[in-house]
Amino acid sequence: MVKIIMHGCNGHMGQVISGIVEKDPDAEIVAGIDIADQGKNSYPVFTDIDACQVEADAIVDFSSAKATDKLLEYSAARQIPVVLCSTGLSEEQLAKVEETSKKVAVLKSANMSLGINTLLKLVQDAAKVLATAGFDMEIVEKHHRLKVDAPSGTALALADS
């Protein structure tokens, strides 16, 4: 059984992942990390990652860039691989992700959906053809007014592809 720490457990994606894992007999969320324990999870929730002394095989992160530095330090110190899905990371944080990945496995993705990852591949292929034909490429995105990171991690990933 894969034991998971859900970092950002009370957010939308944290709850989606919690629901999926709950139905999987081969995985279990053994702890959650979030700024508050809202009492809606079947596992213990810690408001300080350093207080989490639970044994785990992996950390899945859907929190925010504000929590990334401490998460990376924790992951490296405890040698727990991390799936990093937070967006809006600074250049310094991206460098820290790179450095941490030399000590422990880090999978970083701006968007985990199959649709977006298929789109990233299609954009790579289209860019090769269109750029050589003289086309200019532009990304335009629209979000609700409460969007935390703009441009979004997905838009940045599309631009990088």
Q: PLM features: what roles do these ranges have?
A:
Residues 2-20, 46, 127-161:
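Active-site-lining helix/loop region of Rossmann-like oxidoreductase modules
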Residues 7, 62-63, 85-86, 109, ...:
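Structural motif
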Residues 23-42:
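NAD(P)-binding Rossmann-fold cofactor-contacting core
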Residues 29, 45, 82-83, 106-108:
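Hydrophobic beta-strand scaffold residues
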Residues 34-35, 87-89, 111-112, 142-144:
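Short, ordered loop/turn segments at secondary-structure junctions
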Residues 40-50:
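Active-site regions of enzymes building and remodeling cell-envelope glycoconjugates
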Residues 49-58, 65-84, 91-96:
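Rossmann-fold NAD(P) dinucleotide-binding segment
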Residues 72-73, 77, 86-108, 117-119, ...:
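Rossmann-fold NAD(P)-binding glycine/threonine-rich loop
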